[in-house]
């Protein structure tokens, strides 16, 4: 983001993309069969950092919503952040989390998609953005910002697919919503602004559903681990939480009736759309649905989501 020279930034992007893809292949090939399950040291510190960042994100979105008269976006951001802060300081400290990170075959496949395809898109974007502003001189060039958001997007996706801790997954989930908003609104035209806020509105609605689900699961079942959640016996309260998580997944993956935001995303530069479709947002929603599959079989929630 701080590098203003195109040539230097292009070298950094290429090297970063190569390292990301190489590490992705190494980790996946090395751990794909046996997997990894671990709890990170300093979990409370990480949680505190996440909380602070969530507050900053919420303030940014609320301010942007008010400034652009998209008040429902501000309301959604305020509600979900307030709910999560309340949960953090009232119930969360009572819940012990045994496994924060899980790398199994499913997350391994997702890591490959994010790391390899995402890196290829970043490499493609180097050449694409070189000529984009030549052909569209009416748009202000913000290439440092553009590439910074691309890599922020990939980082959030890695965190999302590797997190067994629902709080961490939720945080990464919301970072992807913010990233998509920033990329879709890149040109700052009226159409781009409207479509970026449409994407933010739908995905923040899903984020609010995600937050409510976390509160239900944490208070009722005293767990915040996705692996533990999927082993619980389906009952009404749990199925309500699962349904809310499915709503979040459907909004993120732009499934009917939440698909309109993805069409609007086409106003962004092509690498943005490629990333949204192939390696980030759409895949995130599908990933969560697959994770929840054990709780969807032979249940009313599963049938409803399928329909």
Segments (PLM) and residue ranges:
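...captures the hydrophobic TM-helix bundle architecture rather than a specific catalytic motif
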Residues: 1-307
